């Protein structure tokens, strides 16, 4: 893409996750606009667990088609639907999240994130994601409900 002048620089290539060109970090570009600071911290802890797990014991790379389908399902159905796993299996989102947490459990324990991640995931499974909560607030109370949600969520402690 760079050689063909299709993009200006590597920063414009839109992978869902990639190594940073400038910093010793992994950039994740899906689900990165969270409603609450606590959700952003939860996402960061999950990504750290995934990265530490993958670097400690790399497994086989999932098929790109499965990644694309899984990403589409997650964007479309969120935590309320069925999601595809890395091997193409499909089950309730809560079950897939549970399998993910079990997979990265050693890394979460080593980094001290296990309890925080479990509480955050449980909160999302019960209360909904930020997107789900915004849709529900708007459906029940219109703009006033959305404004009220933003007022409480955007000022909540992490």
Q: Each predicted region: which residue ranges?
A:
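C-terminal accessory/tail domains of diverse enzymes
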Residues: 1-158
């Amino acid at each position: 893409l760079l050689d063909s002048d299709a993009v200006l620089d590597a920063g414009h290539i839109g992978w869902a996750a990639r190594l940073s060109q400038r910093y010793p970090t992994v950039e994740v570009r899906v689900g990165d606009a969270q409603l609450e600071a606590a959700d952003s911290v939860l996402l960061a802890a999950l990504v750290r667990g995934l990265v530490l797990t993958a670097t400690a014991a790399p497994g086989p790379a999932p098929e790109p088609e499965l990644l694309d389908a899984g990403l589409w399902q997650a964007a479309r159905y969120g935590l309320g639907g069925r999601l595809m796993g890395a091997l193409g299996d499909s089950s309730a989102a809560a079950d897939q999240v549970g399998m993910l947490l079990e997979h990265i459990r050693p890394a979460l324990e080593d980094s001290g994130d296990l309890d925080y991640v479990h509480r955050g995931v449980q909160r999302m499974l019960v209360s909904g994601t930020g997107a789900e909560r915004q849709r529900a607030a708007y459906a029940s109370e219109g703009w006033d409900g959305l404004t009220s949600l933003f007022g409480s969520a955007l000022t909540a402690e992490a």
